[in-house]
Amino acid sequence: MSKSTAEIRQAFLDFFHSKGHQVVASSSLVPNNDPTLLFTNAGMNQFKDVFLGLDKRNYSRATTSQRCVRAGGKHNDLENVGYTARHHTFFEMLGNFSFGDYFKHDAIQFAWELLTGENWFALPKERLWVTVYETDDEAYEIWEKEVGIPRERIIRIGDNKGAPYASDNFWQMGDTGPCGPCTEIFYDHGDHIWGGPPGSPEEDGDRYIEIWNIVFMQFNRQADGTMEPLPKPSVDTGMGLERIAAVLQHVNSNYDIDLFRTLIEAVAKVTGSTDLGNKSLRVIADHIRSCAFLVADGVLPSNENRGYVLRRIIRRAVRHGNMLGAKETFFYKLVGPLIEVMGSAGEELKRQQAQVEQVLKTEEEQFARTLERGLALLDEELAKLQGDTLDGETAFRLYDTYGFPVDLTADVCRERNIKVDEAGFEAAMEEQRRRAREASGFGADYNAMIRVDSASEFKGYDHLELNGKVTALFVDGKAVEAINAGQEAVVVLDQTPFYAESGGQVGDKGELKGAGFTFAVDDTQKYGQAIGHLGKLSAGALKVGDAVQADVDEARRARIRLNHSATHLMHAALRQVLGTHVAQKGSLVSDKVLRFDFSHNEAMKPSEIREVEDLVNAQIRRNLPIETNIMDLDAAKAKGAMALFGEKYDERVRVLSMGDFSTELCGGTHASRTGDIGLFRIISESGTAAGIRRIEAVTGEGAMATVHAQSDRLNDIAHLLKGDSQNLGDKVRAVLERTRQLEKELQQLKDQAAAQESANLSSKAVDLNGVKLLVSELAGIEPKMLRTMVDDLKNQLGSTVIVLATVVEGKVSLIAGVSKDVTDRVKAGELIGMVAQQVGGKGGGRPDMAQAGGTDAAALPAALASVQGWVSAKLQ
């Protein structure tokens, strides 16, 4: 029986829930636990720390439908998307996971039951093939003896990638760490499609398609390459939703499943395309999925890192829309149809629909302004191309000047059977790439980061001073047993009052003290379940096992608490004033300021800013108790607690409430009552990206300082105007009105002087074949007056060519005017260009009027002297 994609997703989750698995929501496309990843690209990403032993959950079995993006970095499918049956920038990975619970037997039996069970997917058993790692006899025997697959459909795959354990059937997290063999399940579409089984010379065909990969994590790879058995083996599986949907819906291409058919029809509608087989429709249908969900997860178009990948995908989609004949912005119109086809997986996208649409529309409009010019330039270059390769320098110029990603240029070239010199492009990009590498940590070895086996207990909600024991020390990322005075290090304690940076709140500062030593803590960070105190040993020596007294900087923490509580009040106030579309997109809570990024499509009006301030200060005056409760995540959401989308929460969460005004999930530190905040003031509101606004605000003493500073400025101004602050507005208005009157009188005098100068100049014109030529350098004339003078002179002289120049602060300003009856022979733009070139400048304009600037004032006399000969030649 054919199932819809949404039904397949739900059936998978229901099946594993019936087998005792916790259904875990998809994590954000922006990984929050792995700096080595650009985007979430597999179901196991959100559980990586669990597999590494750095995190623990209150369940040992889990199942997910994880949103993934593969575009940029190691997994870059972008150039193939739309041109093959199964490449996507965005896909959903169905997965089931065991954290030291079941292993090979149950994992294989679960997979077989779901795929072939009459009440589940009911696939014909004879169509299923499997592969196992060459030496994994255990998995082989389970498939053969327990499941009953014939030997000829079980294929052993060895180290087929040129190194020990380098195999399609051996999975490794990195050079070190958890790894193990895997078994893959393939579906045979039938002999009407070309291709051979896995491991055969024809394996790249489309007949045998991998639908499920089951990884058995049973080893811990050491730095020397040896494999140590894990004490608790685990299971990580992944099945592409789109692939299994194609199988269950009896189609050979992912783009023919119900989800994509609906999206492709929507793309055709908004672009005006009638050919539903056009590959550009497939490209756009794929790209709207990745782009919409990336924006919903907080990624915005930019020229670096994740934002640049998003920009590349958007621009590729827009360019394909251009190829289909789209005459206006269209891409953002696909968000609505996408939400409809995603079903329950699109709920968060629906909540942010307006924001996502605005970001996509703005980016498309920006690109549309350069797309036409960029394509025209590329067409010119391709038309004069000798050979079949476009040079990298041209590709870079398109990128640098017109914002064309190189893969978009390659797309255009591929349609004409032309290659792009990507090596040349990379050479031209090297400086930017070097800077990007320095600024980004993406691609670092996850396993080389600080890893702490022990956990730290945070007790800073109730204590600012605590005795603890050193459980680990790190210098330059490496574990050490002891440090001496002057050394910088990371100190891990068994328990600590220091808050580690999280949720936008900065880490605590303070001191660790003990017998003969003092360690100054400049920052506090999380390392898995451990809390690291970063700083410098200012005196004595410190070693693992030492007892310490941990003292948090109390005054600094107090200011942070006020700012964090005020952030919650402001978030609630923004949603009241601007609407419930407001969602947090980033925050910083420090001891000096609070910064809050949120979704909103326009600048806030002064009245809205004042209303938010008033609402927050009203809650401060109410002196509400700030209460925290620990409860189940579902119960917290039912209570109305706001959760940050994409943030990882445990099943038991901390709910922070301020009366009936604000309820949020939060692990940060807060004031006891809203009245402790004292005063709240917004000091700035600005835009950070399309659809994202930023507010900076201060509280308590910081807020009072801004009040005093503002009062001092008003008093200073009043003193300058010889008045007092009470009638300051009237005084300023009077001064501005007097200034406007004086400026008007001054302009009248300048106009009179220019008119008189024009009258004097007209007598200096010379006759060239019936055309009056006037060339003059003017002293003491503002550049903006030159245009008025040219208009006056054209009226006085009739058939004429005029060139005027002036020099102000070493900069040359030029203007050329040509009467209409002469423009067929002398064009002002060409004339001014000739003169400007001689004075180190450039310019242009209409045939009858053109302007230019230059930097070489010394060359001006000679440049003006050349005009008569140039004009005379044109008039012959």
From Swiss-Prot:
Residues in coiled coil: none
Known EC number: 6.1.1.7
Top EC category: ligase
Pfam families xrefs: DHHA1, tRNA-synt_2c, tRNA_SAD
GO biological process: alanyl-tRNA aminoacylation; negative regulation of DNA-templated transcription
Localization per Swiss-Prot or TrEMBL: Cytoplasm
SUPFAM superfamilies per the UniProt record, alphabetical: Class II aaRS and biotin synthetases (SSF55681), Putative anticodon-binding domain of alanyl-tRNA synthetase (AlaRS) (SSF101353), ThrRS/AlaRS common domain (SSF55186), Translation proteins (SSF50447)
Main location, first listed in the record: cytoplasm
NCBIfam families named among the record's database cross-references: alaS (TIGR00344)
Family to which this protein belongs: Belongs to the class-II aminoacyl-tRNA synthetase family.
Free-text note on domains in this protein's UniProt record: Consists of three domains; the N-terminal catalytic domain, the editing domain and the C-terminal C-Ala domain. The editing domain removes incorrectly charged amino acids, while the C-Ala domain, along with tRNA(Ala), serves as a bridge to cooperatively bring together the editing and aminoacylation centers thus stimulating deacylation of misacylated tRNAs.
Protein name, entry field: Alanine--tRNA ligase
Gene: alaS
